[in-house]
Regions:
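A polyanion-binding, active-site-adjacent surface
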Residues: 1-133
Length: 133
């Protein structure tokens, strides 16, 4: 589904760097515990700093919460159902301004079919970033 969503807005999968906040899957696909996120967060921070992205699209609530808190958007935080598809701008530690776009995780559409249409609309928001590449 992710490849399909990227293709729908003209972004080749090869142009996207995808990583996870927790680097190994929690048992039985449970939500990650706070101590697991804390353990792996420095690795994610270093990946982001090395790549210096112009846009971070968070997939799911755990990455949304971490990234928005980490990069000074904690005052904008709300449930993913309220802020998905919105664009937030923040200044990164290296001085660049970037956009952060919270999105539902594509896997959520497996369990909740109406989210597929929501994801398609939310990905459309990022189409303008492709044009301004």
């Amino acid at each position: 589904l992710l490849d399909e969503l990227l293709a729908s807005i003209g972004i080749p999968r090869a142009d996207v760097y995808i990583t996870n906040i927790v680097k190994d899957r929690p048992p039985e696909n449970r939500d990650p515990f706070p101590d697991e996120i804390a353990l792996y967060a420095p690795f994610l921070d270093r990946q982001i700093e090395a790549i210096k992205p112009k846009v971070i699209a968070t997939l799911g609530r755990f990455s949304m919460q971490y990234v928005m808190n980490r990069y000074g958007l904690d005052f904008e935080l709300d449930s993913i159902s309220k802020i998905h598809g919105q664009v937030f701008e923040t200044e990164m530690p290296w001085g660049d301004k970037i956009k952060i776009v919270p999105l539902y995780h594509p896997a959520a559409a497996i369990y909740n079919q109406h989210l597929k249409e929501t994801l398609k609309k939310d990905f459309e928001v990022m189409k303008s970033f492709v044009a301004s590449k």
